[in-house]
Amino acid sequence: MSKLQQFPLSKGWSFRDSEDTSEDAWMPVPVVPSVVHQDLQANSKLKDPYIGFNELEARWVNEKSWTYKTVFQKPAAPAGSCIVLAFDGLDTFAKVKLDGNVILENDNMFLARRVDVTKALEAEGDHVLEIDFDCAFLRAKELRKQDPKHNWASFNGDPSRLSVRKAQYHWGWDWGPVLMTAGIWRDVRLEVYSARVADLWTEVQLASDHQSAQVTAFAEVESVHSGSHRACFTLSLHGQEIAREEIGVTENGTAKATFDVKEPSLWWPHGYGDATLYEVSVSLRKEQEELHKVSKKFGIRTAEVVQRPDKHGKSFFFRVNGVDIFCGGSCWIPADNLLPSITAERYRKWIELMVHGRQVMIRVWGGGIYEDNSFYDACDELGVLVWQDFMFGCGNYPTWPNLLESIRKESVYNVRRLRHHPSIVIWVGNNEDYQVQEQAGLTYNYEDKDPESWLKTDFPARYIYEKLLPEVVQEFSPSTFYHPGSPWGDGKTTSDPTVGDMHQWNVWHGTQEKYQIFDTLGGRFNSEFGMEAFPHMSTIDYFVENEADKYPQSHVLDFHNKADGHERRIATYLVENLRTATDLETHIYLTQVVQAETMMFGYRGWRRQWGDERHCGGALLWQLNDCWPTISWAIVDYFLRPKPAFYAVARVLNPIAVGVRREHHDWSVTHAQPPKTSKFELWVASSRQQEVQGTVELRFLSVNTGLEVRERIVHENVSIVPNGTTNLIVDGLIDHRVHSEPHVLAARIWVDGQLVARDVDWPQPFKYLDLSDRGLEIKKISESEDEQTLLISTQKPVKCLVFEEREGVRISDSAMDIVPGDDQRVTIKGLKPGDAPLKYKFLGQ
């Protein structure tokens, strides 16, 4: 008997170009996990591919094969134990050799692999571990050539990527570079044990009244020799053991224990309650000796997707612990192209930003990776719901038998690895593969329910999404909802707004509609939509080295924007709405204003629709983050610097939010003639679970003078509908013949005497307004060691006051509209006495 021991193989590696067999070709690897681009940079063989045009200088790496090698000593292995070589992730085509003998061949980046090397390590002393990483870029092309009959329809990247189980964005996307990584991208170690807990998971049954829960813990045990093992299960809350049970392990290597929990503390998404985590542990014992112990945290909660017929079609929204949740949030792409560089701390900072921005759901997009455990741990601990795609994106995937088997193993492994996370509330089969099917005219008959027949069509990938994956989820995580694709809705056209989820790209892409009408373009759940914006100047300074290149249309800036047609799209939305500028800093700011306004118009309207029989169940913007310093749809850039849209979304997602808007007048199709009258509406959206009383004020303030142009409207003792929308004015009228000067509609709401939310509706477009000479005043009214409070006032309405984003500094609010008679406070944390004040900018400055 021996207690499980782990020996990390993170040091002592070297690598070389596989074709260069000379002894001096070997270069040191600083640490594993790593990928080849990191190791080449560490050896000064590659420049930072994120700077300038260096991505092009790194392209040679994409077509190379690489060999990694280390030498280790055989670990001490007591009698009756085994030695296992464990890889948590190999990227991607890897032939593993131990002392010259092939012990493993890998072709799937998303799989962990384990090899029993007990016999291979019988000899004492040094052993050589060598891994040949074949070129995935070239292998993919070979695989594609082998199946010329398959329709390789796809968006983004080389279509051959569909043949390889590797992160699809490595082939390049419309927001990221082409960097074909290879290497030991997750941990590698030796394990010595006589028996181990191979898996630990729970199944939770929560009573409908939430007063009790039944927690069943399961353990799967592997042992070298048969014998009587016992499993001691413990259940803990906040570090305190609350239950314990010891049970024998069955002959087939399983054990389970059931715990009854009275008055359980539930897991809630943030804003709805505490994200309480219980911990289950199992200690594997033999003759009272502990051989292995494993612990996992989980939550007691229910989660479902509610799909029911209604007046709008068929609903699609999330319900957690019986409470309907409007899921405002973002889509997530991998946070780096060089994946091992993402630390647990960096993951947590991203999720903390989600909470700071009042976003309740993050969608792990299907062209990236099944994320690191630390990502999901942060979501669990901070109360962020996870929409989890399987890793299929924008293509018609082949279904060769060996590929299907690899996909099955991949999906089983990752569903089992992640099933204990209470944050994961949905598994989704793919990203936009059904859109590829539609656009390529591939065969799809929803009424055909014979999976074997799907494999014979020109859209065989349907078998993956409607047969293979749902069976895996049902077997290994039966309480988690499965959705065949995103977007998808009952086999109907993916753009159908009455059912399922939809990706609404007719702002920016498609018909390039006005962002002011975004809310009219949505569906039952809007899981993608977006608008590009430049990152802050400090980020551009990182990747643009030459000062002469710092102008809006420079070659290097265009190179760092991978979206097709971005020039004309950015220009269109700028010219339609704003007074354009040629200096880079102002251009950056103007693109950010457009993005912030776009997100505000979408979220504000869709959240209002939540109150109309759950017409809109949620909105996940594209995208939260970047994988390199770039110009993209991200609302927070690669360096975790929020763009103005981040703050605009946070305000709309306030637990109680007031909204005001006048009807859209499309100036661009009416010869810019102003309307004679305009209708306006006023409402309150609330995610509170109880009715509250509030006072709502609406003022009409001149843009030119800051004075009120008509009598304000005040609604006192308003009963705010819980978890819904309270419409206060639906037929308001502005007569522009009487009130001819441009004016804003400024709304505020007080609850229990506290001002809780604001909204300001502006005349559109901004380019017709003179926004200079605002009389803005910003005063520092308090200061401590690392916190300042600013008081902001103005004589005339100010649009989109944006503060500088500085490393280590967090701002409570930015991208703000300031109106006379409504001073606002902003708290700045991380700015120390003596530090230079944050710069700021507003529209028209």
From Swiss-Prot:
Keyword Hydrolase: yes
Superkingdom, natural source: Eukaryota
EC number: 3.2.1.25
GO BP: glycoprotein catabolic process; polysaccharide catabolic process
Miscellaneous information on this protein: In contrast to clade A beta-mannosidases, which are likely secreted, clade B proteins appear to be intracellular.
Cited function: Exoglycosidase that cleaves the single beta-linked mannose residue from the non-reducing end of beta-mannosidic oligosaccharides of various complexity and length. Prefers mannobiose over mannotriose and has no activity against polymeric mannan. Is also severely restricted by galactosyl substitutions at the +1 subsite.
Family: Belongs to the glycosyl hydrolase 2 family. Beta-mannosidase B subfamily.
Protein name per its UniProtKB record: Beta-mannosidase B
The species this protein was found in: Neosartorya fischeri (strain ATCC 1020 / DSM 3700 / CBS 544.65 / FGSC A1164 / JCM 1740 / NRRL 181 / WB 181) (Aspergillus fischerianus)
